[in-house]
């Protein structure tokens, strides 16, 4: 007999409802979560057997938006949702981040979490109910998980704090964060700010953590009533006999020498050679032991790293704990692109390239409404950047996530369309990777934007912070490299200007962070950011005064909205003529803004003049140089502006002489003559005159 239960709780002023046992009966665990009128179904399925010979926990999180949830029909020919969109991938990564560190370290069974958006009320975002639902479904499945966890979105508008603010308020917020955690610590932080000071940022995290405690208690009440059976699994355990044998065969000093090798590639080779040596020696005795040897060597390397940091206060590359790697910057490295920069920090190297376009905003199909994107950042991580040979299969989730993070870091500095009417695309190519490539992309983007002449008011820099923790002892590491990321407990990416933070993302491998750790991390990151900004500002202190000669020219005109029809013309005749004659692209906004994109300044100016001619108001007394397009017995029809034709009656021709000697001028087809507007009748018909000219 299935147990069907429904639980309700007020959460941040709205009803949170969780239904258990109502749907998805074949899943290991499932929760139907409704917040406001936004509804998500979260399912968890765990395989019965552990995955052999893997040195990681095989967790997959999928977030799926059904467009019917927002009353939409998918675009395209098939009218059906396809592969995951960028927002879906970013939401999946967001949900994954606080879940992963809380699973038991000896749990190696495959787990798949699927979040399906069923209803969206255009007010309550789907991210918070998704994280809460995932936590609830996992604990009710009985999986070895140190939950439950809570999550809130917190916003600050400069005066007030908002817990789970409505989506409609997001554009007015100076700080917008998603924070997840347990009762005792913070697990995940992700969000953006408009140059928010560190003390405000920390205050927001503390308020968010306090607000989520109620929803954690709510899940504990549900758990106590349901009382699910624990999930039986075969734990991954290192064979103690093998461990002793390995550490007798390979000394701690050999492992220490390997991780203290200065170069990343040499360090990796030294560690891999050690592992191969051990596997070849013990495989005939113990059989397949690759995963176990990886675990043994990695745990010993982690112990050595912790000892060096916590006891000796130094790092494997000789740096102090709060020291950044050597930084170098170069701009204008590619001659025909619109802007470029090469940013290098230690062995991490990123090339960022800017392209300026017109009217090419990115439209994203999602249940959550979003404005077309004028600023786009793409991040590429080719295999050669880590010395590997792999097939290229398009951007992976990590690349999409890193690209979005670096995009958010620069977004508050991007000028409004009225100030700079270009669509801006930055592509960051990772040429060499030894940690913190996403933050190097932030720095490279900032440099390349200034090189392109994009009027950002100041530079943005980013740095990744790490953590070594044993019990209550901890040290925060500034500007972590790959080894410190792999063996450490935290990857806290923080980007911003001298005025404050613009974007953050926290990944952890420990059970959570205290406020003390977060506060120290923010302080060290600020110091490091200032050092990096010093170097960037010396390279290019402000945007170039002119954009690249190879970039398109854009002019913006403002016309009376009532004149849009005149500009377009019958069946688009007028606008087509401008485009064909000037080789430009023209975009007309309903409010009367006309965007002209041209290959050069001359074409832009010619198109602008034609737009002004088509939309100009004609008044009595105006004088034009017109062209005669038809001659009749009673006068001539003269085009005074494109599409604007008036009648010059023969009585209004210019005359010479007086009395019987008076003669009327001769006007022929094709003549260009100076003409004056004599009158305009109520129907808009124009009468012209040549007299008194």
UniProtKB/Swiss-Prot annotation:
Alphabetized GO MF terms: 3'-5'-RNA exonuclease activity; magnesium ion binding; polyribonucleotide nucleotidyltransferase activity; RNA binding
Gene3D superfamilies assigned: GHMP Kinase, N-terminal domain, K Homology domain, type 1, Nucleic acid-binding proteins
E.C. numbers: 2.7.7.8
Keyword Kinase: no
EC class (word): transferase
Pfam families named in the record: KH_1, PNPase, RNase_PH, RNase_PH_C, S1
Binding, Mg(2+): 485, 491
Positions of the S1 motif domain: 621-691
Annotated GO CC locations: cytosol
Biological processes per GO annotation: mRNA catabolic process; RNA processing
Function: Involved in mRNA degradation. Catalyzes the phosphorolysis of single-stranded polyribonucleotides processively in the 3'- to 5'-direction.
Protein name in the entry: Polyribonucleotide nucleotidyltransferase
Organism, as annotated: Dictyoglomus thermophilum (strain ATCC 35947 / DSM 3960 / H-6-12)
């Amino acid at each position: 007999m299935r147990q069907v239960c429904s639980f309700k709780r007020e959460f941040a002023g709205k009803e949170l409802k969780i239904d258990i046992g109502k749907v998805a009966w074949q899943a290991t665990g499932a929760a139907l979560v409704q917040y406001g009128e936004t509804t998500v179904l979260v399912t968890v399925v765990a395989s019965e057997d552990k995955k052999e010979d893997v040195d990681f926990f095989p967790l997959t999180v999928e977030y799926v938006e059904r467009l019917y949830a927002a009353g939409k029909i998918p675009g395209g020919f098939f009218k059906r949702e396809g592969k995951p969109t960028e927002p879906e991938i970013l939401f999946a990564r967001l949900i994954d981040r606080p879940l992963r560190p809380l699973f038991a370290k000896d749990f190696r069974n495959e787990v798949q979490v699927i979040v399906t958006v069923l209803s969206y009320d255009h007010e309550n975002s789907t991210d918070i109910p998704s994280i809460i639902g995932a936590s609830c479904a996992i604990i009710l499945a009985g999986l070895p998980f140190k939950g439950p966890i809570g999550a809130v979105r917190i916003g600050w508008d400069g005066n007030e704090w908002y817990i789970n603010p409505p989506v409609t308020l997001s554009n007015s917020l100076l700080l917008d964060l998603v924070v997840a955690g347990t009762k005792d610590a913070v697990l995940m932080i992700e969000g953006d700010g408009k140059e928010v000071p560190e003390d405000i940022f920390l205050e927001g995290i503390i308020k968010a953590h306090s607000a989520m405690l109620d929803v954690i208690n709510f899940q504990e009440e549900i758990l106590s009533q349901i009382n699910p059976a624990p999930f039986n699994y075969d734990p991954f355990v290192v064979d103690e006999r093998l461990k002793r044998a390995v550490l007798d065969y390979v000394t701690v000093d050999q492992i220490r020498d390997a991780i203290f090798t200065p170069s990343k590639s040499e360090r990796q080779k030294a560690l891999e050679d050690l592992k191969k040596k051990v596997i070849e020696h013990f495989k005939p005795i113990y059989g397949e032991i690759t995963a176990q040897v990886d675990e043994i060597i990695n745990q010993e390397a982690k112990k050595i790293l912790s000892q060096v940091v916590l006891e000796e206060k130094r790092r494997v590359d000789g740096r102090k704990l709060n020291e950044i790697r050597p930084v170098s910057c170069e701009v204008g490295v590619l001659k025909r692109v619109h802007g470029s920069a090469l940013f290098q920090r230690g062995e991490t190297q990123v090339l960022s390239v800017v392209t300026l376009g017109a009217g090419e905003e990115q439209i994203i199909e999602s249940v959550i409404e979003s404005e077309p994107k004028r600023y786009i950042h793409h991040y590429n991580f080719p295999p050669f950047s880590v010395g590997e040979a792999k097939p290229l299969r398009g951007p992976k989730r990590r690349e999409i996530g890193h690209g979005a993070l670096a995009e958010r870091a620069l977004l508050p500095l991007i000028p409004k369309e009225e100030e700079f009417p270009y669509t801006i695309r930055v592509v960051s190519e990772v040429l060499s990777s030894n940690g913190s490539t996403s933050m190097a992309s932030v720095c490279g983007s900032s440099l390349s934007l200034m090189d392109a002449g994009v009027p950002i008011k100041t530079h943005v820099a980013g740095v990744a912070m790490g953590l070594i923790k044993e019990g209550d002892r901890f040290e925060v590491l500034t500007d972590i490299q790959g080894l410190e990321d792999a063996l450490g407990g935290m990857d806290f990416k923080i980007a911003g200007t001298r005025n404050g933070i613009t974007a953050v993302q926290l990944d952890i491998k420990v059970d959570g962070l205290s406020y003390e750790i977060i506060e120290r991390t923010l302080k060290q990151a600020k110091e490091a950011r200032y050092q990096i900004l010093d170097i960037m500002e010396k390279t290019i202190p402000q945007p170039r005064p002119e954009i690249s000669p190879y970039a398109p020219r854009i002019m913006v005109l403002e016309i009376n909205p009532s004149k849009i029809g005149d500009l377009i013309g019958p069946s688009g005749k007028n606008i087509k003529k401008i485009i064909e004659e000037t080789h430009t692209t023209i975009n007309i906004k309903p409010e009367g803004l006309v965007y002209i994109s041209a290959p050069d300044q001359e074409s832009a100016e010619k198109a602008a003049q034609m737009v002004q001619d088509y939309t100009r108001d004609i008044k009595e007394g105006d004088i034009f140089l017109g062209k005669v397009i038809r001659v009749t017995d009673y006068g001539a029809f003269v085009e005074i502006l494109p599409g604007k034709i008036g009648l010059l009656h023969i009585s209004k021709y210019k005359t010479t002489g007086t009395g019987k000697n008076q003669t009327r001028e001769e006007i022929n087809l094709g003549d260009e003559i100076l003409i004056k507007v004599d009158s305009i009748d109520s129907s808009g018909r124009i009468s012209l005159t040549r007299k008194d000219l």
